[in-house]
Amino acid sequence: LAEGGLVNRRDPFPGEPRWYQMTGKGLAHIGNPLPTPGVNLSEYKHDVGVAWLWLAARGGTFGPLAEIVGARRLRSLDGSRERGAEPAGVRLGGFGPHGRERLHHPDLVLRTADGRRVALELELTPKSRTRLEKILAGYAADPRFAGVVYLVESRAVARSVQAAARRLGVSDLVHLQRVRSTVSRSASKPALTAERAPGSRTRMPEAVR
């Protein structure tokens, strides 16, 4: 694939497994209309984790699904939608650059056969209180979403999400799942595995069971 120009081989960090990135030619070959993905090495761990989440969803971890949509596709849909059309992302209120309404795009959106949606957010680093509350308020105001699952690695991030959900009165909408990431420079097989926090009362939404 690399020799044919369909993917680029990359070795971003010494001692870390090589990874591959689709090229424009590769995307065209499989009929994918999305633009060539960019590279942000500061988000490497997050992006690899989301890829593992996508594979888990495709493999049935979250139950039968009609569709799995990633953030890149959501942003692409919103970038080309007509004025007045419903956005693919979650409305945050207000407008940003060029007069576009402010939107948040989940890492993954799982759609069940009956049309319900559940957002997956891989939250490896904390957001500011203001930013997090705006996102949760956006989910609460969007009737398309049956729930949002925050997959967190640290207890501090878990507490931050729980506290924000309580302040906004949306605890029933927000679900937490602890995960352990082996996406590191020493891991030969990067992965993302779920673990249940002791005493946790959170659960997956019924929409994806």
Regions found by a protein language model. Name each.
Residues 10, 45, 58-118, 124-131:
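Active-site metal-binding core of divalent-cation-utilizing nuclease and nuclease-like domains
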Residues 34-51:
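A short, highly charged nucleic-acid-interacting micro-segment common to nuclease
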Residues 1-38:
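Nuclease-adjacent, charged terminal/linker segments that flank catalytic cores
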Residues 5, 61, 143-146:
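Structural motif
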Residues 126-209:
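Non-catalytic C-terminal interaction segments of nucleic acid-processing enzymes
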